[in-house]
Amino acid sequence: LQTGDIPMDKVMAWVMTNPRQNRKLFETALYQGLDQLPEQIPALTEFFNLVEHAPSWFDASKLETAIQLTHRLGSNGTYIMRDLSLMTGYQYPGFNQPLIITGALKKYAGKRLAETHKWWLDVTQLNSFERFNSGFTSTVYVRFIHALVRFQLNKSSEWDRDVWGEPINQYDQAMTNLAFCSVLLLGVRA
């Protein structure tokens, strides 16, 4: 509950020293590569050197099998994700405090669903996690947005860290992962 996304939070601390300029530099590194930056930027170099290399436990064949399963589900998978995984998850107020405080559930619910759906489509394409493919860039960009929200909420008087922990913390991310995986599997059995 007390840990966010340390590597991306370091990037966000750097971005917020000059938000307009540094966000553009981050996006250049994400979508075009570090070699397209005007100079080496240690915060970005450290982060991208980390995420551009798969962890030792990663098994590409298992990921490919999972992606093929999602393709076999067709539109049923999308409905289960929207109507069961997301809607069930949105019912937990503690877990969703970042969405509630930022207005993402009230004012921007449709946009939030569309963004999540786009991310899902991006990560369920074959080879999507290769460096410049959509699954990779979408996932890193989601991490960026989460770090931005975390940065802002940590400055907000509305955020009760003693009750909710770090905004968009590792525990909440694990619960999201369970909703997107386990609930999907339960839904297809129904």
Question: Which sequence ranges carry the predicted segments?
Answer:
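Mature, function-bearing regions of proteins
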Residues: 1-190
